[in-house]
Amino acid sequence: LSINGTEDQPAKCGLAVADTATGMYIANGVLMALFNRERTGNGMAFEVSLFDSITEWMSYPAYYTEGAGKPLRRTGTRHATIAPYGPFRAGDGGVVFFGIQNEREWLALCEEVLGDTSLASDPRFHTNPQRMQNRDALETLIEQKFANFSADEVLERLEAASIANAHMNTVEAFLKHPQIH
């Protein structure tokens, strides 16, 4: 709860994170034991705890807090240290999720996705720290540009620009996904 939600309202995770982490480490332990048995002919025992598993998964917030001397802020669907990052509404009402992780992606977003090279040199957005300081204005500009496109068109542009992205689906849309049927 201390890292999820917004500054005003914490939020629980959508699933049992500690249980999922522990299951992942158990699966890895079984694979390691099978590999060891294949190589040496000997079995092996291992232990996994919920606490140890979630401790590993909490390493980023822990290292950030230790290194920065302050905890990560709860940022909702935003990222604590990257902008732009999160869900953005397109002109057809669909929601697209993406995050800019480096300078190449920032330039590609401005030029290839938004079609506005002036944003790349705008002093408010030139570096990631500046984009973080002016995040509200940047997100507004992005959604204004996206208003001219459907979610599918935005996704195509992001894909062509090699920017990690996803369409934000409802549970109903997920259940209709062709890979499920």
Question: For each of these PLM feature ranges, what is it?
Answer:
Residues 1-100, 108:
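Active-site-adjacent "lid/gating" segments in soluble enzymes
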Residues 51, 101-103, 168-171:
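Histidine- and/or cysteine-centered catalytic micro-motif in compact active-site loops
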Residues 56-60, 129-137, 175-180:
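Short, solvent-exposed polar/charged micro-motifs at secondary-structure junctions
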Residues 84-161, 165:
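Aromatic-enriched alpha-helical interface/lid elements that frame and gate functional surfaces
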Residues 160-181:
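A glycine-rich dinucleotide-binding beta-alpha-beta segment and adjacent secondary-structure elements
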